[in-house]
Amino acid sequence: MTDSRANRADATRGVASVSRRRFLAGAGLTAGAIALSSMSTSASAAPSRTLADGDRVPALVIGSGYGGAVAALRLTQAGIPTQIVEMGRSWDTPGSDGKIFCGMLNPDKRSMWLADKTDQPVSNFMGFGINKSIDRYVGVLDSERFSGIKVYQGRGVGGGSLVNGGMAVTPKRNYFEEILPSVDSNEMYNKYFPRANTGLGVNNIDQAWFESTEWYKFARTGRKTAQRSGFTTAFVPNVYDFEYMKKEAAGQVTKSGLGGEVIYGNNAGKKSLDKTYLAQAAATGKLTITTLHRVTKVAPATGSGYSVTMEQIDEQGNVVATKVVTADRVFFAAGSVGTSKLLVSMKAQGHLPNLSSQVGEGWGNNGNIMVGRANHMWDATGSKQATIPTMGIDNWADPTAPIFAEIAPLPAGLETYVSLYLAITKNPERARFQFNSGTGKVDLTWAQSQNQKGIDMAKKVFDKINQKEGTIYRTDLFGVYFKTWGDDFTYHPLGGVLLNKATDNFGRLPEYPGLYVVDGSLVPGNVGVNPFVTITRLAERNMDKIISSDIQ
């Protein structure tokens, strides 16, 4: 986006902006719940009043992932009553087994979003499919399928923080400056990175414990084989509480990270957003969360603000009600896919026709490629494996094979001799979201062949390790047989509503004052590391500007 677009946004913002007094006037929506006598340590402390048809709210946040959680916290701290609309459920009620989430080895309906079968990235082992039939339910992990890729996303209060491995990685500064040149990197690295790390509860594993525990034998084996081929490895921070994990290993607390839990949620240990940012927002007494509601339309309202249409669904995904509410300001935080699809649809259908032509562009899969190697029997990986990754192979500085590869667990409960890696490659390929008038849906133009550049980069690294070790790839993990590379999915969707192109330099949609984008759709397709910390930090930076310039 040019400076002129930003200046135009500043000029028009005053015409249609809503004053802070008007924002505060909407407090009636949450008045019954503001005077809470005590606060729990999770977002379940937020009032769960369901939005009613015809309600008016000062600030509506679509989604409760990283960007949405930051927006909710900073708005409520500024005194603004804020309503989050979340498509998934609130994961705060145990099932019949006494647990909120199910484990990976024995998944049930809680595992997947409105699916009849689990859909794990490692789908096969030694010729056998390992996905299992389940009852259809609003489970925690979604694998949304497009023609060339499936995208894993978290569903529920806390978004992707509920289902990821928690690796809290800071991107290389020179690469951050390359992909987001309009953002002051000094400010980001000196102010917003530390703030986000604190807010997310980032911590580091005790390296002495790491070296001795059986639970990280897989990571030590992955490190050893990488280093023998001349590659650099690095410890990586995480939001899983490693002191809790030590107690798990000692048998003092219930196992989660050591109990086969991660992609379908952790019952303990992980500092997901419902326990950090969202819990802090709830503690202000000004946050309300409406769950099991899916936003389908946003358009200017008569007079001022925006009309937001949403569908209420039941736990089997059936639409049980349609509602229209009015919001003075709307913050899009439905994730790279959700926000991009919604805005592309709104532009194409004439509800927000003046959105930039850049909306929908610049989507990428963060270069995600998964691969497994078959180690020799003397390089075992262990029958006991923590589900929380703590180490990666850092080859980003190599221009011929720039990758950062997470040494991933394969917690099967038995010795597999498999080293598994989730590689983030510097794949330059991008795609766009586009409206399909024939189906009325939004398509993604990504083709599976666009992963070939990423495969080529990863292959240079892992071919070298295999050659040095005298080992081979596992070809039975991502299909029945003869499929080496997991190249048909991503855990790290990024882009679609790029910062300073589709928005101004702070996530405003300048053609529509009062509309903001605060999630991973702002990041142009690849950040070189696990992206959630970057998304959080960018949201912190943007919300500082939005609150100081547009609201207060």
From Swiss-Prot:
InterPro entries: Cholesterol_Oxidase (IPR052542), FAD/NAD-bd_sf (IPR036188), GMC_OxRdtase_N (IPR000172), GMC_OxRtase_C (IPR007867), TAT_signal (IPR006311). Predicted to be exported by the Tat system. The position of the signal peptide cleavage has been experimentally proven. The active site is at residues 406, 492. GO terms for biological process: cholesterol catabolic process. Its cofactor is FAD. GO terms for molecular function: cholesterol oxidase activity; flavin adenine dinucleotide binding; steroid Delta-isomerase activity. It catalyses: cholesterol + O2 = cholest-5-en-3-one + H2O2; cholest-5-en-3-one = cholest-4-en-3-one. Residues 1-45 form the signal peptide. FAD binds at residues 66-67, 86, 160, 164-165, 167, 295, 520, 532. This is Cholesterol oxidase. It comes from Brevibacterium sterolicum.
